[in-house]
Amino acid sequence: MKLTQEDHNWLEAYRQTLDQQFPGMVEHILLFGSKARGTATKESDLDLLVVIRRGDWRLKDAMTRPGYLLATASDVVPSIIVLTVEEWELLQKQQTPFWLTVQQDAVVLQ
C-alpha cells in the first residue's frame, strides 16, 4: 500500500463522515488499484469501493458526494464506487473482471 499522509487524512475524514451521515450502512470499505498495490504515481487516483448493506442509486450518490467534497480541500483524487452487498455478491458469483481485480488488490479499510 502506497498512501500519502494526505490520502490517510482524506480516508479517515471520509470514513468518519460516512459513519456520521449513514450510521450502520457501510459493510466494507476497500482500497484497490495502484495505491493498494503500491505502484501509485503522483497522477494516480485513490480507488475506493464502499459496500453498503442496502440502497438505491440515490443513496449511493449521496454517499459518494461527501468524499468528493472533502477532496476539494486536498490533492487527493478519489474514484469512489458504491455497491450493495447483493450487487457485490453477484459480481463475485459472475467472477467479473472488476471483482477479480478488487479481490487481487484490495486492502480492507473497514
Predicted segments with their positions:
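Conserved H-loop
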Residues: 34
